[in-house]
Amino acid sequence: MRFFKLGKKEFNWKYVLGEILLIFIGINLAIWFNNWNASKKAIADKKVAITKITEEVMNNNNQLDIAQEQNHQILLAYSEYKNKFDGNTSLLLATPAEVIELNSKYPGFYRVSDSTLLENGVYRYNGGTHILLEIPILNEIAWDTTKTLSILNEFDYECLYDLESMYSLQRLVQKEINKAADALQKRELKELMNILGFLNQLNRQLSQNYKTVLENIDNCDS
């Protein structure tokens, strides 16, 4: 009878280490590829966000300019008419020539229903003020959407600072606009004029902020 001796099988460390190395390389390649994809998507999202923010700011700026012009006219009209008001904004003490001049400068601001001759050619006019308050729609949809995309770290710090500062001031302006609309609804004209005067200052500042952001928005993509 012949006997065979089983030899001890050697463990192949080189093979095992090679497999481990391949797995390690594979994992790192997968991580790198995922990071590359995420970075590529973030850059693409950032470009879209900048485009949408630019469009939003331009539209808001146009809305603000229209409202600013209209509401500034209201302030001018009130400042000239208030010296002619007789106790309230329903009664006006003026000559026909003065009324014609005021109406030509500020059409529709005061509408006469009847008049009574007093003396020296002065009439007491009975009527009422009619104010068309321009309410701008100042959006921040693009900015809010950008903040939900987790791409703010892709933006330059100065760019982020300017954007947040601009939208913060815009919210303050919107709050004052709402106050103005409420004062008009309640026919609180003195309060309305105070608010519009304050808004006049805020609007100029916001308009400058819009201009600054639009001039520097391309730097956000650097």
Q: Residues of each region from the PLM?
A:
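Long, hydrophobic alpha-helical segments that serve as membrane-spanning/inserting helices
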Residues: 1-14, 35-222
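Hydrophobic membrane-insertion alpha-helices, especially the h-region
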Residues: 17-32
